[in-house]
């Protein structure tokens, strides 16, 4: 038995995402969309944030996160080294730039994001419908596409993802600021289109994925009275008082000017630049950067193969 002396609060998955994002945002009022691969309260939830806190508006029947993940498993370039891993989504997003969306297939993919009925994608295979198995549980060679065909499937999935998302967003008041959170808010292609197509303030937290849930739970327990900006509150790379002195001595390091940095880049060098503390979340947002000259034709390939050790199609 356990002696419980204090009340334990339990916050639901998307409520926690929404709270973290709202209290980190600069907005006093906002429409909050939280969507990902799913939690105890669904996959796609909409909230209103205002002076009274974060309140639920809708639970949408959709699975954009799981659907997009499964689309990644259909493309060999994406799936062959990382099947069933969450990295599939980010890789699919990178690969889609090499393909062209197949317009006639977009509606089927759109429907797929709402119900994840894989049989709606049966036209992608040569198997009779009765022989189709769940490609997520039982990967079949017939489901895997490669080369330009695979790139086009990736582009089609991304296009359908965007249209499906906009079809939901258009149901709500366009005159209030918008906050996007949940793992799907890491799809920067969607975020950029929202920014360009919708004339409204937009905020995406640096940690919209599940790594931000603990902060959201804290905010639900004790609501902040002002914006909490933790974007650059991660760990420092070096302790200036101890580590920096050690490495300066070890490598006989000297201070460099901005002009010298520019000259090194001009000469084809690849540099790592670090400022202050690390960013919170999975994305580098300026305080830790790899910089190089993009005018060098094969620089992307050099970065991917020798520095980041990742797939050839990943962008800068």
Predicted features and spans:
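Flexible beta->alpha loop and helix N-cap segments adjacent to enzyme active/binding sites
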Residues: 2-9, 15-116, 121, 186-187, ...
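Short, flexible coil/linker elements and helix-boundary hinge sites characteristic
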Residues: 3, 126, 173-175, 252
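Short acidic-aromatic active-site loops that bind/stabilize oxyanions
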Residues: 8-11, 147-163
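Short amphipathic alpha-helical segments, especially helix-boundary/capping motifs
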Residues: 45-46, 139-146, 168-171, 193-196
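Active-site cores of enzymes that catalyze phosphoryl transfer or operate on phosphate-rich substrates
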Residues: 94, 105-156
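Alpha-helix N-cap/helix-initiation motif
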Residues: 154, 158, 179, 203-210
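Phosphate/ATP-binding catalytic cores across multiple sugar-kinase/actin-like superfamilies
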Residues: 155-178
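Glycine-rich beta-strand-to-loop/alpha-helix junction loops that act as flexible
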Residues: 177-186
